[in-house]
Swiss-Prot record:
It is found in: Cytoplasm. Functions in the N-end rule pathway of protein degradation where it conjugates Leu from its aminoacyl-tRNA to the N-termini of proteins containing an N-terminal aspartate or glutamate. It catalyses: N-terminal L-glutamyl-[protein] + L-leucyl-tRNA(Leu) = N-terminal L-leucyl-L-glutamyl-[protein] + tRNA(Leu) + H(+); N-terminal L-aspartyl-[protein] + L-leucyl-tRNA(Leu) = N-terminal L-leucyl-L-aspartyl-[protein] + tRNA(Leu) + H(+). This is Aspartate/glutamate leucyltransferase. Belongs to the R-transferase family. Bpt subfamily. The lineage of its organism: Bacteria, Pseudomonadati, Pseudomonadota, Alphaproteobacteria, Hyphomicrobiales.
Amino acid sequence: MNTQATPSPQFYLTAPATCPYLPNQMERKVFTHLVGPRAPEMNDLLTQGGFRRSQNIAYRPACETCRACVSVRILTEQFQPTKSMRRVLAANSDVVATVHAAEPSTEQFALFRRYLDHRHQSGGMSDMSALDYAIMVEDTHVNTRIIEYRVREPGSGIDSSKRGELLAVALSDVMSDGLSMVYSFFNPELEKRSLGTFMIIDHITRTRALGLPHVYLGYWVDGSEKMGYKTRYHPQEHLTPRGWEIYSPKEE
């Protein structure tokens, strides 16, 4: 009987580039392509090993002099929202979340551009076009979903034909042990809603309902103010050289 071996993934190392998170640092990444029938399995294994997905690429930092980027995952079963998080849930009690296939829309892109123009006027994503956005959403060989968050239309009930204002969008991968939040964005003018926090709590709730243990948030960068929000959700684990370990915040 002839058997054809599945080729092992090939890994590559990027050239040094300026770090987008910390001053006076250079970054390098190791990456591989997520394609073919084994892509979902590989995405699971690599994410559990500290990689992140971007389109059909899985990557992780491989910096020569810095180890500030740390993979973070929330333990969904033990998670309890804080008082401020409960206020966020109350402020968004009029929001309805709907799960869709990984397909872009002009409405999503318009919100995406508003978010970038307000929050990320510089950086690698600042000049993304509608085509770039479509590629970001569609170029996936794993189980990826789009979650749209909208204001509930008065009297709409379960009638999905009545759609309220689009407030936020999350691009997420469904994995064997949880959900991985690949990218999310929201209306930056609605600060009082704290939509970023709301989406993370919603993912925790969804993951728990699936009976799965983890929500992956990507990298927390110690010393980067814009990444600080990722350590607010407890309990959570950080990937260390010894494996995944419970994170204990430093005493102020």
